[in-house]
């Protein structure tokens, strides 16, 4: 609570870094919030950036998040990039004096998490990591069953999650494989 600050103007000026599927999901939601204004969008993949600009044509486009962070007209950022970019962007955003909302996971390594934690503690900004399943009824019920002892000691777990589509996405040319399908590669997804 002590880190919460009153915004000095009528609307929170938000920038999105990463405008793929999750970034566009956030754009749709932000457009429904009267006290939020999307002022900038950033992506280094031109088709995603173009789609974001179609959704919010008044936003300033960027291809380099560092240039976006230099803007004094941005109060906070939403980070929806591949996981390997979370730590560097969060750290740079806090250093630039921006509030930060970042998609899960926080970072790839404990050292990166510690660096984020330390930097956040030195800032006066709000930092939040999106953990969408944490509040899902099924997960809450499962944790209640574990904590109550209803199912005994948990010694192992096997889980499957079925998506509506394959994780692999089509790529327009082979050199974009790792950029578009980053979730499938250890160096970018953990």
Give names to the regions the model predicted:
Residues 65-69, 143:
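Short hydrophobic/charged patches on amphipathic alpha-helices used for structural packing
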Residues 60-64:
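Conserved SAM-binding strand-loop segment of SAM-dependent methyltransferases
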Residues 52-59, 115, 119-120:
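Short, conserved SAM-binding/catalytic segment
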Residues 40, 76, 156:
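Short, Asp-centered acidic motifs that coordinate Mg2+ and/or phosphate
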Residues 18, 125-128, 133-190:
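Predominantly a Rossmann-like dinucleotide-binding segment in NAD(P)-dependent oxidoreductases
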Residues 35, 58, 73, 150-153:
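Glycine-centered tight turns that cap/initiate beta-strands
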Residues 76, 82-83, 87-135, 149:
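Beta-strand-loop-alpha-helix segment that lines the small-molecule cofactor/substrate pocket
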Residues 1-56, 136, 146:
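N-terminal Rossmann-like dinucleotide-binding module
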């Amino acid at each position: 609570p002590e880190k919460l600050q009153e915004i000095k103007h009528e609307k929170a000026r938000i920038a999105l870094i990463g405008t793929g599927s999750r970034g566009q999901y956030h754009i749709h939601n932000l457009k429904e919030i009267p006290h939020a204004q999307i002022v900038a969008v950033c992506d280094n993949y031109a088709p995603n950036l173009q789609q974001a600009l179609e959704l919010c044509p008044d936003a300033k486009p960027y291809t380099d998040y560092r240039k976006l962070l230099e803007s004094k007209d941005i109060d906070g950022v939403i980070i929806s990039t591949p996981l390997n970019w979370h730590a560097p962007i969060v750290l740079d955003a806090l250093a630039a004096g921006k509030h930060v909302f970042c998609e899960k996971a926080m970072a790839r390594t404990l050292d990166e998490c510690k660096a984020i934690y330390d930097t956040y503690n030195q800032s006066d900004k709000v930092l939040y990591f999106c953990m969408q399943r944490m509040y899902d009824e099924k997960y809450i019920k499962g944790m209640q069953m574990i904590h109550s002892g209803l199912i005994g000691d948990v010694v192992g777990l096997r889980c499957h999650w079925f998506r509506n589509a394959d994780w692999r996405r089509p790529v327009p040319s082979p050199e974009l494989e790792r950029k578009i399908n980053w979730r499938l590669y250890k160096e970018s997804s953990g």
